[in-house]
């Protein structure tokens, strides 16, 4: 089944962007997934094609109108999860990417300005999703990031399906260090265990390094990993 991605945006020309290259681009050409963009401005209700207005109660900036967004959303089949890219949303992570990759598709709403009228979130049951604790100029960049994370997990996208299973976050840890030729670079050698041919020793070393890196760089992630490990 083809994964169907739909993006509601004021800037459809931003898509597929970098998703037209490498793994995602090849998968798009091969028909593993499809991408449709919907121009929100096409659903404006006045001759000026306005999609925003001043915030109720005053304040800086503009807010995207609920009626315009509703018309844009209602023009699309309600056949997939509907997400609003938002800095106040649920944190997007690898587990959620894997969950969405098992769905038939996803519909992404890209906000602009100061955000969207709260009533469209309630009325169309949009789930807010965030890719990090920072502010972007709009939801398009976040949507591209989210789709990249999802598409690479679709069956047939990665040449070696095992490639994704040892990456950061897949087992609750950051990924272990990687090495390749030359064996010596500016006096730095590949750890001998990796060239020993001893598969058990290599696996143990990689696990130890993953735990060490996670404990040093992401203590909150390691605490969760350790808690789950103790349960089992």
Swiss-Prot record:
UniProt cross-references to Pfam families, sorted A to Z: tRNA_m1G_MT
Sites where the protein binds S-adenosyl-L-methionine: 111, 131-136
Catalytic activity, as annotated: guanosine(37) in tRNA + S-adenosyl-L-methionine = N(1)-methylguanosine(37) in tRNA + S-adenosyl-L-homocysteine + H(+)
Assigned EC number: 2.1.1.228
Location(s) in or outside the cell: Cytoplasm
Example GO BP: tRNA N1-guanine methylation
UniProt xrefs under InterPro entries: Alpha/beta_knot_MTases (IPR029028), tRNA_m1G_MeTrfase_C_sf (IPR023148), tRNA_m1G_MeTrfase_TrmD (IPR002649), tRNA_m1G_MTases_N (IPR029026), tRNA_MeTrfase_TRMD/TRM10 (IPR016009)
GO molecular-function terms, A-Z: tRNA (guanine(37)-N1)-methyltransferase activity
Annotated GO CC locations: cytosol
Task of the protein: Specifically methylates guanosine-37 in various tRNAs.
Protein name: tRNA (guanine-N(1)-)-methyltransferase
Gene that specifies this protein: trmD
């Amino acid at each position: 089944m083809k994964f169907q991605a739909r993006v509601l945006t004021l800037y459809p020309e931003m898509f597929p962007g970098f998703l037209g290259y490498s793994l995602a681009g090849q998968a798009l050409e091969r028909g593993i997934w499809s991408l449709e963009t919907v121009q929100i401005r096409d659903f404006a209700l006045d001759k000026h094609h306005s999609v925003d207005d001043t915030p109720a109660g005053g304040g800086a900036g503009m807010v995207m109108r609920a009626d315009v967004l509703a018309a844009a959303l209602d023009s699309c089949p309600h056949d997939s999860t509907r997400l609003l890219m938002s800095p106040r949303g649920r944190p997007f992570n690898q587990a959620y990417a894997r969950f969405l990759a098992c769905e038939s598709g996803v519909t992404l709403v890209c906000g602009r300005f100061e955000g969207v009228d709260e009533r469209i979130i309630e009325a169309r049951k949009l789930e807010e999703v965030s890719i990090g604790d920072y502010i972007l100029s709009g939801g398009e960049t976040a949507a591209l990031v989210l789709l990249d994370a999802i598409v690479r997990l679709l069956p047939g996208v990665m040449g070696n399906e095992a490639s994704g299973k040892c990456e950061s976050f897949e087992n609750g840890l950051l990924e272990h260090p990687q090495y390749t030729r030359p064996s010596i670079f500016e006096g730095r050698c590949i750890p001998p265990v990796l060239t020993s041919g001893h598969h058990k020793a290599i696996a143990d070393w990689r696990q130890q390094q993953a735990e060490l890196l996670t404990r040093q760089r992401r203590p909150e992630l390691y605490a969760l990993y350790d808690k789950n490990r103790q349960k089992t």
